[in-house]
Each structure stands twice: as structure tokens, then as C-alpha cells.
């Protein structure tokens, strides 16, 4: 479904969070997403909107859909966001971040609690009085780079948090596990390998 070789950089090729923006009520998909993705959405009667801009292999056109939305905020780096995403989030406060690969690097856990692997993002959120757990990106595997990001290795469904790999193998794993249990999350490790940044785990 997510064979997207040749569209964007090899390290993020096939990553859902590069091609798809998702919030509680919307799914916005890059128009040049793999055909099989559109077939899957249509066959399963999953509502979505097509974005206006294609994903490409430069920074500016590979981060357009990689933003994070909560009921109150839209987090991204200003000037990089797909216009269709801005349109449906006009009522929210835009929070300027230093990292354009926002969804890769930031997870909204619940209410005012966040998880990030980016010190710049952590600084912005803490300055706003939000709770932010910093998770070292080292040991998160990704193709063609030294390390990936925590957002690309995580998915949340209800009170369950899924890890692409085993979070307990990471140097910060035990601390994060305790933090998540304090927030009443059920932790599900999808393998016994080190965490792998595959572009976020989305539930549609």
C-alpha cells in the first residue's frame, strides 16, 4: 500500500505521516500518494480530502502534511503547511515550531501532555506551560540516517499506545513507560526489536 519509491527521499519513502494529515475529524491525503492507498480508503468507505500539493523530495514539499493538530492547537513550522490543512484549522491557534517534520517528532498524549524527540520543540512547549516528555532519538532506527524520531515509531488509539518495536529496549524506555502508566496508557510493543521510525502508526 505504501510503496512510494521515487516520490520523496528514500528515508521517508512509504511513511504515512509524509503523505497523510490526520486529526480527530479529518484525513487529508497528498494527491500523489500511492494509488493503492486511495483504493484502500475508497473500498473501506473512509472519508478523506485530497490536498492541493504533491509530496516531493525537497524539504519544503516533504513536510507539508507532517503537522500535528489537537483540539486547541495546530503545530508546525510556519510557511510549510498544506493550505487545505490550514483551512480546516482556522479556528485553532497556530504554534510555530523550529522543526518542520513536526508529526515525526511530536506526539500528543492527552490533554496538555506531549512526547517529543526534539529539544527545540520541547523548549517551545515548556515555555507555553505544556507538559513535554523528552525522549532521546538515539537508538530509533530509520533508513539512511543515524536515527529517527519518536513520533514516527508511535500510534495512539484510545488509551492504548503502540510502539513500532519495543520501547523498553531504549535507554529512555523505562522512564517513558512509567510516565505513560501514570497517564493511564496501556503500552503495546509490536515487536521485540529496537524502535523503528516507519512514519507514524495511523488508525483510520
Description of each model-found segment:
Residues 1-204:
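Histidine/cysteine-enriched polar flanking segments
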